[in-house]
Amino acid sequence: EGPKAALMDALALGERLGFKTGVADNRVGWVEYGDGEEMVGVLGHLDVVPVGDDGWTYPPFGAEIHDGKLWGRGVLDDKGPIIGSIFALKAIRDLDLPIDRRIRVLFGTDEECGSSCVEYYVENGYEMPTIGFTPDGDFPLIFFEKGMTRFTVGGKVTDKGNIEVEYFGGGIAANVVTP
């Protein structure tokens, strides 16, 4: 429900700004600008990890501004970067900057739970970018995404003298464990 609403909002924004838009079965949407055979893909996502506990300073889905900062789920990961990328397309167009290929901002709806949206896009023959990047990261720029693994640790510790766990965090979604 939430990711689909975010998908429709992002597509509507692209349309209001006068861009070409498309959607793959409500799993992946895109906003596109430019001409040319080659396409730059800017890949992000609109879903968020489950809210979890009640320890929020501000309502998690409120998108409220406090002390000049926007607070809410997805502000940094990854709705904010997607909206920023769409407005970057607008700036490129409005400044009439020369580009010789298309730029497609792609936004999936389930990155936090396995990225089946990307698999769907690829497996159903939608156009693949010639080159791309993701704004889903930290500053300064990083040049790779972390991998994902799921595992269960079990058993008994028999040699307690060699084991020391200082901290192990986690959450509801697989990619929210922090060191």
Describe the predicted segments one by one.
Residues 39-107, 113:
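Active-site metal-coordination/substrate-binding segment of hydrolases
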Residues 30, 104, 150-154:
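Beta-strand secondary-structure signal
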Residues 1-52:
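N-terminal helical capping/dimerization or prosegment-like subdomains
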Residues 36-40, 66-67, 99-103, 127-131, ...:
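Short coil/turn connectors at secondary-structure junctions
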Residues 11, 83-90, 119-123, 154:
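Predominant activation on well-ordered alpha-helical scaffold segments within soluble catalytic domains
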Residues 2, 6, 81, 117-118:
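Residues at alpha-helix caps and immediate loop-helix transition turns in enzyme cores, especially N-
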Residues 112, 118-179:
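Midchain, well-structured core segments that form catalytic/ion-binding scaffolds
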